[in-house]
UniProtKB/Swiss-Prot annotation:
Organism taxonomic ancestry: Viruses, Riboviria, Pararnavirae, Artverviricota, Revtraviricetes
Source organism of the structure: Squirrel monkey retrovirus
Biased composition, class Polar residues, residue ranges: 117-132, 193-206, 323-334
Name by which UniProt lists this protein: Gag-Pro polyprotein
Keywords: Aspartyl protease, Capsid protein, DNA-binding, Hydrolase, Lipoprotein, Magnesium, Myristate, Nucleotide metabolism, Protease, Viral matrix protein, Viral nucleoprotein, Virion
Residue span(s) of domain Peptidase A2: 863-939
Length: 998
């Protein structure tokens, strides 16, 4: 019964303490308070025996905690001990007159009385010094239990003392705390409360409480040499003291919140801890002698302090502990807890009537956050103006703009500051994008940092949602939360689109003629990061484009090192950087004055002994003049005239010689010089013939050295091309520009710089070069009409991802064939320079409301459907499909007016047959919810159906071409010598189907 009553009193005291703290806007849990008092009972075993709780007794508890921290180290003390201590101290100190606090002290007094140990009534026993030493626990610090009597003036032990003789005093002798088991003298009663002493005795005969405490501790130290030293001597190694065991005190499970150091007292001072408030009985001697004794004790304490072996260590009286990491002192302006702040901010409670039993059943809870005092500074408008200017000039994601934002974010901006900065610096569209990205990243952070149970306000703090939309509340966020806000703001800012960034193809990014290679690679990598994401700027595809899209000068510098396995593009940048210096020197040398051109430029040097022999045998070279003209008015044109051309060769661009004398195989950029057109040795078109009248053979003229002239030369026509040999059937067509062919931009139309028309009574057939298919290039064949006058184009496609076609590459040939006129009927008088290709006449049939239907048999079963010339395959409705015919699901897509994913298809090939006996095989698709069956081109092509238009104009054209109604275009009615391979039946009327009304 007594234990149950004790537990009920404990619960009542803890409940009152929680209510007192809740009034101060502090939330604590019951199990934390129980753990805290359990540690207090372990550290201060005299506290339950004190029988009272007030500010004075609680101050002595703080002294004991400070001594325990100094001796055993911070690792032996729970992290929240000093915080809870400070909270309870403030409750006892600041509101001692409150009825609630008085009731709380009363409940605590009852608990301490119930846990206190009654004083022993055993007769006093004399213990010698040796017995004291043998009975003292070797590994336990002396107890400071306040329930013992202290003998001040005992000299029975015969010990020598530095103090004056106290035999004249009538006070009882002071005893060591180790003698607390002996019965105290009856003339010195034990007083559990100092208030009893003040009410029972005369005020003139009592000591000051401070002097009384000093006297008691000095006397106990004097009579007990093993009393803990009050000076800051080197402390013993820390050890874990044994738990307090008492049969009278039941074990209590306890724990508690976070506190700060008390403001009273100087840390590390040598003052002794306050002993329990044990009041002495009315002294029998004069008070002056007691005061002189007190002065002597203080003098002795001072001397003992001077004898310390080591200087006093600067140990804090009460260490400040918190859950957040320590903030360095050099981080000015960041979040740091105030040293005197020991309150916890009020958190929004979901249920104000939360019971204590719910607190006890919680397995884990969100740790209470301390209040953080920031040296918060609002955003400076000048800084925002700088960021706004950088965004307007360079874009929001430019390196300089991002550097400004990162520098500003080091101040740990709140969500309100980020929103204000986004509205002020970004445009309307970018502001909306930033907000959406910030909210998305905030949700991700909240999910990653979520604990169990999840915090009620975790997802609301990072985006600054209600009730944390106020900037003052946001400034109190802990450093860890502000770090997440900083990271979310920067990530959202860096995800904004670049200024003027258009969605362009990566293959279209080329290096300009005057652009540095590093700038070109930078643009290429930025586009690759924007299209493919970060980490793709060093991929093999980007490296390939860095070579293929570079200008010829950089390509010639990179080409020797292209085959090497390069992990990065840094070596390419080095090669092109050195090559750019050489190009700059060459460009500077091209702008030499005419006088500087007169300087000797020997092509080679030969040392000879006989100049006469050298003049006769040496090849004739253009020699520069040996000396400059002496006449100042002499014309320089005559001097330069004998020096050859004043500009570099247009063919190789390397030397000052004529293009006709150029024998270089590579140009200045290292590119091979490709001879355009056919070979130079080929004769003119047609065979040689002999003029019998004149008696000699006529030879064709020699073709020019460069059959593909530059673009600045006059137009070239088909008749200007040359054949390779007399038996060559085709004329080569070359590209006039450098081209990159990809699967994305193919088919691609390229001009060849050759114009029509063709020779009379001929037409051209465009065919591909035989070696192109092996390179992944496909040239689509075409027909070149006789009267086509525009520029000839060729149509290319590729089967590879990327193919480069240099300028001047031979891609196709024109085969000139004779044109045979059938009749004089034509649609237009001439072709002109319209688009390349054949100008066929299209027969158009007007579609009416009637649907052309056809009945066919599939495996003997009759089906009716609509002729659909736009459908690639036949589709049967699922309602018409027999249930016993097997189906299979195929991984394909059917697209038309609608779309079907993974449709069903016949598992076997079906045989179709029409009413005229024509048959074939198909594998139709089967779709649900299809109202009619569709006959696709897979059946129509096998039936060899043609569409006949009743248009009068079309019919006139067909009749002029030899068409006989009711008959096919036979060999006798068309005028051609070759027969038609397929002759339709002459008795076949129409298309073999009839048109039904819908």
């Amino acid at each position: 019964m007594g234990q149950a009553s004790s537990h009920s009193e404990n619960d009542l005291f803890i409940s009152h303490l929680k209510e007192s703290l809740k009034v101060r806007r502090i939330r604590v849990r019951k199990k934390d308070l129980v753990s805290f008092f359990s540690f207090i009972f372990k550290t201060c075993p005299w506290f339950p025996q004190e029988g009272s709780i007030d500010s004075r007794v609680w101050g002595r508890v703080g002294d004991c905690l400070n001594d325990y921290y100094r001796v055993f180290g911070p690792e032996t003390i729970p992290i929240t001990t000093f915080n809870y201590y400070n909270l309870i101290r403030d409750v006892l100190t600041n509101q001692s007159d409150s009825p609630d606090i008085q009731r709380l002290c009363k409940e605590g007094h009852k608990i301490l009385i119930s846990h206190s140990r009654p004083p022993s009534r055993q007769a006093p026993v004399t213990i010698t010094t040796s017995e004291k030493a043998s009975s003292r626990p070797p590994s336990r610090a002396p107890s400071t239990c306040p329930s013992v009597a202290i003998d001040i003036g005992s000299h029975d032990t015969g010990q020598s003392s530095l103090y004056p003789n106290l035999a004249t005093l009538t006070d009882p002798p002071i005893q060591s705390p180790h003698s607390r088991a002996h019965t105290p003298p009856q003339h010195l009663p034990l007083l559990a409360n100092s208030k009893t002493l003040h009410n029972s005795g005369s005020q003139d005969d009592q000591l000051n409480p401070a002097d009384q405490a000093d006297l008691e501790e000095a006397a106990a130290q004097y009579n007990n040499p093993d009393w803990p030293q009050l000076t800051n001597t080197p402390a013993l190694p820390p050890f874990r003291p044994p738990s307090y065991v008492s049969t009278a005190v039941p074990p209590v499970a306890v724990a508690a919140p976070v506190l700060h150091a008390p403001t009273s007292g100087v840390p590390g001072s040598p003052t002794a801890p306050n002993l329990p408030g044990v009041a002495l009985a009315k002294p029998s001697g004069p008070i002056d002698e007691t005061v002189s004794l007190l002065d002597g004790v203080k003098t002795l304490v001072t001397k003992l302090s001077d004898l310390a072996l080591l200087p006093p260590a600067g140990v804090m009286a009460f260490p400040v502990t918190r859950s957040q990491g320590q903030v360095s002192s050099n981080t000015t302006g960041r979040a740091s807890p105030h040293p005197d702040t020991h309150t916890i901010p009020e958190e929004e409670e979901a249920d104000s009537g939360e019971s204590d039993s719910e607190d006890d059943e919680e397995e884990s809870s969100e740790p209470t956050e301390p209040t953080y005092t920031h040296s918060y500074k609002r955003l400076n408008l000048k800084t925002i103006e700088k960021i706004k200017t950088a965004v307007a000039n360079y874009g929001p994601t430019a390196p300089f703009t991002v550097a400004l934002v990162e520098s500003l974010s080091e101040r740990w901006l709140t969500p309100s500051d980020w929103f204000f900065l986004s509205r002020a610096a970004l445009s309307g569209g970018d502001n909306i994008l930033w907000k959406s990205e910030y909210e998305d990243i905030s949700k991700q952070f909240a999910e990653r940092t979520r604990v169990r149970p999840p915090p009620k306000d975790g997802p609301l703090k990072i985006p600054g949602a209600s009730p944390y939309q106020n900037n003052d509340k946001q400034a109190q966020f802990p450093p860890g939360l502000l770090t997440q806000i900083q990271s979310a703001g920067l990530k959202a800012w860096k995800r904004l689109p670049q200024k003027g960034a258009a969605t362009t193809s990566l293959a279209k990014i080329r290096q300009g003629p005057d652009e540095s290679y590093s700038d070109f690679v930078s643009r290429l990598q930025e586009t690759a990061d924007r299209l493919f994401g970060s980490g793709e700027s060093e991929s093999s595809f980007v490296k390939h484009l860095a070579y293929e899209n570079a200008n010829p000068a950089c390509q010639s510098a990179i080409r020797p090192f292209r085959q090497k396995e390069l992990s990065t593009m840094s070596p390419l940048l080095w090669y092109c950087s050195a090559h750019a210096v050489g190009l700059a020197i060459g460009a500077a040398l091209q702008n030499l004055a005419p006088a500087q051109l007169l300087e000797p430029r020997p092509a080679f040097a030969i040392i000879v002994t006989n100049p006469a022999i050298f003049q006769e045998t040496a090849p004739k070279k253009i020699q520069p003049p040996t000396q400059l003209p002496t006449q100042p008015n002499a014309p320089q044109a005559s001097l330069i005239k004998n020096l050859g051309p004043t500009t570099k060769c247009p063919r190789c661009k390397k030397g000052f010689h004529w293009a006709s004398e150029c024998r270089s195989r590579l140009d200045i950029n290292g590119q091979p010089i490709i001879k355009q057109g056919n070979l130079e040795q080929g004769p003119a078109p047609g065979p040689h013939y002999r003029d019998e009248l004149r008696g000699f053979t006529v030879h064709p003229p020699i073709p020019p050295a460069n059959p593909c002239p530059p673009s600045n030369q006059p137009r070239r026509y088909v008749t200007d091309l040359w054949r390779a040999t007399a038996g060559s059937a085709g004329l080569d067509l070359c590209t006039t520009t450098d081209t990159i062919l990809t699967t994305q931009n193919s088919p691609l139309t390229l001009p060849v710089g050759i114009y029509g028309p063709l020779p009379p009574q001929t037409f051209g057939l465009i065919l591909a070069e035989p070696a192109l298919p092996s390179k992944g290039i496909q040239v689509l064949p075409g027909i070149l009409d006789n009267d086509f006058e525009g520029e000839i184009h060729i149509i290319l496609s590729t089967t590879k991802d990327l193919v480069t076609i240099p300028k001047g590459t031979r891609l196709a040939q024109i085969v000139i064939l004779p044109l045979q006129q059938i009749n004089s009927n034509f649609h237009k008088p001439y072709r002109g320079a319209s688009a390349p290709g054949s100008s066929d006449v299209y027969w158009v049939q007007q579609i009416s409301q009637q649907r052309p239907t056809l009945k066919l048999k599939l495996n003997g079963k009759l089906f009716s459907g609509i002729l659909d010339t736009g459908a690639d395959a036949t589709v049967i409705s699922y309602t018409h499909w027999p249930r016993n015919w097997p189906l299979t699901t195929v991984a394909t897509h059917l697209r038309g007016i609608g779309q079907a994913t993974n449709p069903q298809q016949s598992a076997q090939m079906l045989k179709w047959e029409d009413s005229e006996g024509n048959n074939g095989h198909i594998t139709p698709y089967v779709l649900p919810n299809l109202p009619v069956n569709l006959w696709g081109r897979d059946i129509l092509s096998q039936m060899k159906l043609v569409m006949c238009s009743p248009n009068d104009t079309v019919m006139t054209q067909m009749l002029s071409q030899g068409y006989l109604p009711g008959q096919g275009l036979g060999k006798n009615n068309q005028g051609i010598t070759q027969p038609i391979t397929i002759t339709p039946k002459k008795d076949k009327t129409g298309l073999g189907f009839h048109q039904n009304l819908p």
